[in-house]
Amino acid sequence: MSTYHPKSGDITRKWYVIDATDVVLGRLATHAADLLRGKGKPLFAPNVDCGDHVIIINADKVAITSNKRDREMRYRHSGYPGGLKSMTLGRSLELHPERVLEESITGMMPHNKLTAASVKKLHVFAGSEHPYAAQKPETYEIKKVAQ
């Protein structure tokens, strides 16, 4: 019998909603990256986009361990000389909590061509409301670990 290789049309995609309230940022990012890649599916293949859609709500209430809010810096560059901007993680979470989660989840994904297609299935919201109720997303629970 020959080995079965899944095609992108053979994959049925589910919708998951994750509540980020008091969940550690790195743990949330690894679970979301695994869902986006489809690592838990029996049809997983690393060369096929077989991941699911992930909705993350309450991104502004994500937990950051130790003193990383004040210590860790975020950098971006405008492309012009002297255009390096820096901001602490805490300030970045105040201004753009969605962007912080998107960057951390993208960093947990493999750096190849499939990542761009997988990240398009990530939907992050700072509040508890999202416009994807018609897709009937399942809740995905992340176990809390004692800190």
From Swiss-Prot:
Q: Which GO terms describe its biological process?
A: negative regulation of translation; translation
Q: Which domain of life is it from?
A: Bacteria
Which keywords describe this protein according to UniProt? Ribonucleoprotein, Ribosomal protein
One annotated Gene Ontology cellular component of this protein: cytosolic large ribosomal subunit
Q: Name one GO molecular function term.
A: mRNA binding
Q: What does this protein do?
A: This protein is one of the early assembly proteins of the 50S ribosomal subunit, although it is not seen to bind rRNA by itself. It is important during the early stages of 50S assembly.
Q: What is this protein called?
A: Large ribosomal subunit protein uL13
What is the species listed in this Swiss-Prot or TrEMBL entry?
Answer: Corynebacterium efficiens (strain DSM 44549 / YS-314 / AJ 12310 / JCM 11189 / NBRC 100395)
Q: What is the lineage of its organism?
A: Bacteria, Bacillati, Actinomycetota, Actinomycetes, Mycobacteriales
Name the gene that codes for it: rplM
